[in-house]
Regions:
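One-carbon transfer enzymes
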Residues: 1-184
Length: 184
């Protein structure tokens, strides 16, 4: 399972604010007026501006589909496969003004099989998101969380993937490289 946010919010009578940009004035005002302690931003590839980071009482938490500080940036699932990593994971962290640089609350590892595809890894990452939230929820609502700064000396940044990055060239690529590219 996937849960569609519109249906979930309607079923549970939860106010839903939609916007194409996380920093819109209406979004910031809705967050402030809600009295939220924490705001979760998951699956949003925009950088939250300072007014959003300051709107909830405690801050903004994000999920990133790598074990930060490795793999800051974009296209985490394809890159994990392309790099031949044995595992990746999910990081719950407090957002700051940087790109995936905030202090870490918790992480959940995800094994990458030899035949992993982007689809299967995406599904594993979704399950890890849920497991991670369940694991930290009590500490989060009782204000017993511990944030650990990231070790910037261990950080790597992965760039966005472009259509031409998926081009297969059988003249210069090995069969293994082509296989990896197709699966990613």
């Amino acid at each position: 399972g996937r849960v569609y946010i519109d249906d979930f919010c309607a079923r549970h009578r939860i106010p839903l604010v939609k916007s194409p940009h996380v920093g819109d004035d209406g979004v910031v005002q809705a967050i402030r007026s809600s009295g939220l302690d924490w705001l979760f931003i998951v699956g949003w590839s925009q950088i939250a501006p300072q007014p959003v980071l300051e709107a909830p009482k405690r801050g903004v938490l994000g999920m990133h589909p790598t074990l930060l500080p490795e793999g800051r940036g974009r296209a985490s699932i394809p890159w994990a496969i392309l790099k031949g990593l044995p595992c990746t994971g999910v990081t719950l962290f407090k957002l700051d003004e940087g790109v995936d640089t905030g202090p870490i609350l918790a992480q959940e590892s995800v094994a990458i099989s030899d035949r992993e595809t982007a689809r299967t890894l995406y599904d594993k990452i979704n399950v890890a998101h849920q497991d991670l939230i369940r694991r930290v929820w009590d500490d989060l609502v009782t204000d017993r969380i511990r944030l650990q700064p990231q070790d910037d000396s261990q950080a790597t940044t992965w760039s966005a993937r472009r259509p031409q990055d998926g081009r297969i060239d059988p003249q210069s690529m090995t069969v293994a490289e082509i296989d990896q590219l197709v699966r990613a």
